[in-house]
C-alpha cells in the first residue's frame, strides 16, 4: 500500500518486563465488571438514547447482573444530569449496585458532578485527563509537569467535594490515552494521584488504564499492565481496571491478557458498542470465561431477549457473526459440520456426559437460550444428509433410513441451490412429502385383502393408467406378497426391498410411518414413504410410493 512510510509504532514498551503473565494458562476468577454502555456506548450512537430508553437499558444491565454501572457524565448535559437524578430520587439503585459518574479535572465540573450525586448512598467518581505524547503536544500544548498538575488538582477537588457531600464515594483515575503514554510517565502520574487519594483497605482507589486507542498487539498491552501493576504505590489498596478499545480488532485479547497481567476490573459494553470500532465486548469476555468453566458472575441465559432489547434501544445491529450474540454463531450449514454436531449431541444423550465437548460448538447453545433446531442446524446448498435428516427428525419425528437420507439430501441441496436461499424446516418437510410420501401417480393404491393371517396370499386393488385392477400374489411375508403381485402383473422389475417403520409421535400419535427402498434395473435405490393410521397400510403406501418414484425417475432419464 502507498504511504506505509507515514506510519510507525506509536506505543511505548515498559522499561522492564517480567512477563509473568505469559506463564498463566487461563483466567481463573472473573473481574469486577463495570458497564459503560450508558456513557461510552451512548455517546457513540447516531441517535443517543432518551432518558426513558436509558432507564430501560439500565434495568436490563441490572437483570444481567452488573454491580457497577457508569451512568453518565452529569456535568456534560441536562439529559445526563436528569438521568442520574432520576435514579437517585426514584430509589432505582439496588443496595448491592454502585453507580459510576465521569468528570474532568475542572472545579465547576466536579462541583456540578457532586451536586448531581446528592442523596446517593455510594458511587464511583471517575476522574480522567489525557496523558499521551500526541495529546500533550498537539491538543493541550503542555509539559509533563503541567499534565500532572491537572490530575493532582483534580484529585484534590474530588476529595474536597466528597468530604462536603453525604455518601460513600470511591475514587477512580484514568490516564486517558494510556497506550500512547510513556510508561514511566503513566506510572508517575498515577502514583502522584494515589498520594492525594491515600487509598486504604476500606476505601480502595481504582486506577483505570484505558487503551483509548489500541496501538499495539495484545501482548504489549499486557506487558504495560504488568509493569503498572508491579510498580504502582499502595498496590494492595488499588483496584487495577482495564478499558480496552477495539481499533485493531483486539479488544477482547487485550482484556484477557491484561487480566492475566494483573488487571482486576473491566470497563466495557454489551456487544462492544462505543466510539469508532467500539469498546471491549463484555458479552464475549464473560462467555469466554464461561466456556472455560469459570462463572463470570453475569447472566446471559436469555441472549435473544438481550440482543433484541439492545438493538431496539440503541438502534444498532448485532452482527450475525458476533460471538455468542449473533444469529448465526452456532449455525452449521456445512454437511460435515452438521453430521459431527448431530452425532456429538446424540453421543452426549447416550453417555450422559457431564462436560460439554460437542464438535464445532464452543458452548451448549441452550445455556444462553438458543435452540439446536433453529440455531444450530441450518439448511442450504452446502448442507449434508445428516443435518437435513436431523431437521426432519427434530421437527416432524421422521427418522429416515441412512441411505434414504443421502438421496433426500441431494434433492434438498438442489432445491436450495436453484433458489439461492436457506431452507426452513417446513420447506424441507414439503420437499420430502412431495417427493416420497403417499405418491399416487401412476399407481394409486386402493385396498388389499389377505385370505387369512397365516397364509401370505393377497389380493391388491389399485388404479393404474386410469383402470381399476385387482392383482393377486403371494410371498414370504405380507409386504413381500404384495410386492410380488405388483411385479408380476404390472411388468415391474426391482429387487433388494429395504424396509423401516416407526410410530409418528409428533402431531398425530395414532399414525405410523414406513419407508421402503427398491433397487431398479439401473442399480439405483428408489425411495418411498407411507403414512397411515394402520402400520401395514403405511408400508404398502411406502412400497407403491417407491415404485412410483422409480417409474418417474426412469421416465426422466
Swiss-Prot record:
Region spans: Regulatory domain: 439-557
Binding residues annotated for Mg(2+), in chain numbering: 40, 243, 245, 279
Alphabetized SMART domains for the sequence: LeuA_dimer
Enzyme Commission (EC) number: 2.3.3.13
Compartments it resides in: Cytoplasm
Needed co-factor(s): Mg(2+)
Classification via InterPro entries: 2-isopropylmalate_synth_dimer, AIPM/Hcit_synth_CS, Aldolase_TIM, IPM_Synthase, LeuA-like_post-cat, LeuA_allosteric_dom_sf, LeuA_N_DRE-TIM, PYR_CT
Keywords: Amino-acid biosynthesis, Branched-chain amino acid biosynthesis, Cytoplasm, Leucine biosynthesis, Magnesium, Metal-binding, Transferase
Pathway: Amino-acid biosynthesis; L-leucine biosynthesis; L-leucine from 3-methyl-2-oxobutanoate: step 1/4
Residue intervals of the Pyruvate carboxyltransferase domain: 31-304
GO biological process: L-leucine biosynthetic process
Disulfide links within the chain: none
Catalytic activity line of the entry: 3-methyl-2-oxobutanoate + acetyl-CoA + H2O = (2S)-2-isopropylmalate + CoA + H(+)
GO MF assignments: 2-isopropylmalate synthase activity; acetyl-CoA C-acetyltransferase activity; magnesium ion binding
Main location: cytoplasm
One Gene Ontology CC term in the entry: cytoplasm
Sequence similarity: Belongs to the alpha-IPM synthase/homocitrate synthase family. LeuA type 2 subfamily.
Assembly with partners or alone: Homodimer.
Function: Catalyzes the condensation of the acetyl group of acetyl-CoA with 3-methyl-2-oxobutanoate (2-ketoisovalerate) to form 3-carboxy-3-hydroxy-4-methylpentanoate (2-isopropylmalate).
UniProt name for this protein: 2-isopropylmalate synthase
Biological source species: Desulfitobacterium hafniense (strain Y51)
Amino acid at each position: 500500500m502507498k504511504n506505509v512510510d507515514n506510519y510507525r509504532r506509536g506505543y511505548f514498551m515498559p522499561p522492564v518486563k517480567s512477563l509473568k503473565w505469559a506463564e498463566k494458562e487461563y483466567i481463573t476468577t472473573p473481574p469486577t465488571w463495570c458497564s459503560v454502555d450508558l456513557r461510552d456506548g451512548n455517546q457513540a450512537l447516531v441517535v443517543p438514547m432518551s432518558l426513558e430508553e436509558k432507564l430501560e437499558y439500565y434495568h436490563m444491565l441490572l437483570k444481567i447482573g452488573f454491580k457497577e454501572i457508569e451512568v453518565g457524565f452529569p456535568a456534560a448535559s441536562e439529559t445526563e444530569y436528569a438521568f442520574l437524578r432520576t435514579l437517585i430520587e426514584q430509589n432505582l439503585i439496588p443496595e448491592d449496585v454502585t453507580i459510576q459518574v465521569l468528570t474532568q479535572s475542572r472545579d465547576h465540573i466536579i462541583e456540578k458532578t457532586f451536586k448531581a450525586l446528592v442523596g446517593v448512598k455510594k458511587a464511583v467518581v471517575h476522574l480522567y485527563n489525557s496523558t499521551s505524547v500526541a495529546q500533550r503536544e498537539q491538543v493541550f500544548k503542555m509539559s509533563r509537569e503541567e499534565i500532572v498538575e491537572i490530575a493532582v488538582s483534580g484529585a484534590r477537588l474530588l476529595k474536597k467535594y466528597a468530604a462536603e457531600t453525604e455518601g460513600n464515594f470511591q475514587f477512580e483515575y484514568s490516564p486517558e490515552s494510556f497506550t500512547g503514554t510513556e510508561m514511566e510517565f503513566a506510572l508517575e502520574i498515577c502514583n502522584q494521584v494515589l498520594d492525594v487519594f491515600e487509598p486504604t483497605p476500606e476505601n480502595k482507589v481504582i486506577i483505570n488504564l484505558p487503551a483509548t486507542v489500541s496501538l499495539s498487539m495484545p501482548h504489549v498491552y499486557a506487558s504495560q499492565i504488568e509493569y503498572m501493576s508491579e510498580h504502582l504505590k499502595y498496590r494492595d489498596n488499588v483496584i487495577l481496571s482495564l478499558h480496552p478499545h477495539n481499533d485493531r480488532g483486539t479488544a477482547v485479547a487485550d482484556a484477557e491478557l491484561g487480566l492475566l497481567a494483573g488487571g482486576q476490573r473491566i470497563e466495557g459494553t454489551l456487544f462492544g458498542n462505543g466510539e469508532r470500532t467500539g469498546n471491549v465486548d463484555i458479552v464475549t469476555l464473560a462467555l469466554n470465561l464461561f466456556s472455560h468453566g469459570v462463572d463470570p458472575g453475569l447472566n446471559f441465559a436469555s441472549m435473544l431477549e438481550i440482543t433484541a432489547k439492545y438493538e431496539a434501544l440503541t438502534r444498532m445491529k448485532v452482527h450475525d457473526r458476533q460471538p455468542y450474540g449473533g444469529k448465526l454463531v452456532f449455525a452449521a450449514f456445512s454437511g460435515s459440520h452438521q453430521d459431527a454436531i448431530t452425532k456429538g449431541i446424540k453421543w452426549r444423550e447416550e453417555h450422559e456426559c457431564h462436560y460439554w465437548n460437542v464438535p464445532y460448538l464452543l458452548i451448549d447453545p441452550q445455556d444462553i437460550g438458543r435452540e439446536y433446531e433453529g440455531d444450530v442446524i441450518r439448511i442450504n446448498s452446502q448442507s449434508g444428509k445428516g443435518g437435513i435428516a436431523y431437521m426432519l427428525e427434530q421437527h416432524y419425528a421422521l427418522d429416515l433410513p441412512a441411505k434414504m437420507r443421502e438421496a433426500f439430501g441431494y434433492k434438498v441441496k438442489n432445491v436450495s441451490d436453484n433458489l439461492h436461499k436457506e431452507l426452513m424446516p417446513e420447506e424441507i418437510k414439503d420437499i420430502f412429502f412431495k417427493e416420497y410420501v403417499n405418491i399416487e401417480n401412476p399407481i394409486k393404491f386402493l385396498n388389499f385383502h389377505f385370505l387369512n393371517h397365516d397364509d401370505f396370499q393377497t389380493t391388491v386393488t389399485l388404479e393404474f393408467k386410469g383402470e381399476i385392477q385387482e392383482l393377486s400374489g403371494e410371498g414370504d411375508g405380507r409386504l413381500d406378497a404384495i410386492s410380488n403381485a405388483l411385479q408380476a402383473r404390472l411388468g415391474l422389475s426391482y429387487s433388494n426391498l429395504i424396509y423401516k417403520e416407526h410410530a409418528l409421535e409428533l402431531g398425530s400419535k395414532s399414525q405410523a410411518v414406513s419407508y421402503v427402498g427398491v433397487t431398479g434395473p439401473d442399480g439405483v435405490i428408489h425411495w418411498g414413504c407411507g403414512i397411515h393410521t394402520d402400520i401395514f397400510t403405511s408400508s404398502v403406501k411406502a412400497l407403491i410410493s417407491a415404485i412410483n418414484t422409480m417409474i418417474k425417475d426412469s421416465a426422466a432419464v
